[in-house]
């Protein structure tokens, strides 16, 4: 199961978070925050992590 950990105002910021977490060895999914599911640059995005890795994300975010 995947849980939302952050929101991003656009795809560029979402990709930056994705790169950051994946650099820490944490698989991430990003999906547009839109019911139309349009994969455009300017729509807000949600950032998801698997439930099993949530504790790792919380620890990484604490260190920021």
Model regions: which residues?
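Acidic/polar low-complexity segments and flexible, solvent-exposed patches
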Residues: 1-64
């Amino acid at each position: 199961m995947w849980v939302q950990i952050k929101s991003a105002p656009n795809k560029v910021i979402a990709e930056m978070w994705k790169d950051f977490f994946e650099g820490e060895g944490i698989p991430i999914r990003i999906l547009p925050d839109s019911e139309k599911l349009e994969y455009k640059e300017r729509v807000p995005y949600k950032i998801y992590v698997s439930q099993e890795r949530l504790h790792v994300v919380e620890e990484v975010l604490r260190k920021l």
